Design a protein with these regions (language model features):
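Enriched for short, Lys/Arg-rich terminal
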Residues: 1-26, 58-62, 66-86
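A short, surface-exposed loop/turn module that caps and links secondary-structure elements
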Residues: 32-57
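Compact soluble domain cores
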Residues: 23-35
Length: 86
């Protein structure tokens, strides 16, 4: 099993700072879990025109990420509450 590093877009950390601390921590912990279980998860594209962008659900939240297997990097693009997706 390969180890993957995490990269967060700057806006994500600002958004998480506005959340209840326990939920922010849970979402951060889940991104670490995704990176450490990358080979055990099924990464389906979220749309045909967004190849490489995947999502993972945590309660009412969605984590959008991409994987750079050459550089062993999981890039977290956004963490969004499902109401904001409509």
């Amino acid at each position: 099993m390969a180890w993957y590093r995490l990269a967060y877009r700057p806006a994500i950390l600002l958004d998480l700072a506005s959340l209840e601390p326990s939920m922010a921590q849970r979402l951060l912990d889940k991104t670490k879990w995704i990176a450490s279980n990358i080979d055990n998860l099924r990464h389906e594209p979220i749309a045909p025109d967004l190849l490489g962008l995947c999502k993972y659900a945590v309660e009412d939240w969605r984590i959008f990420y991409s994987i750079d297997r050459d550089n062993h990097l999981v890039d977290i693009h956004s963490i969004v509450h499902h109401r904001e997706l409509r």
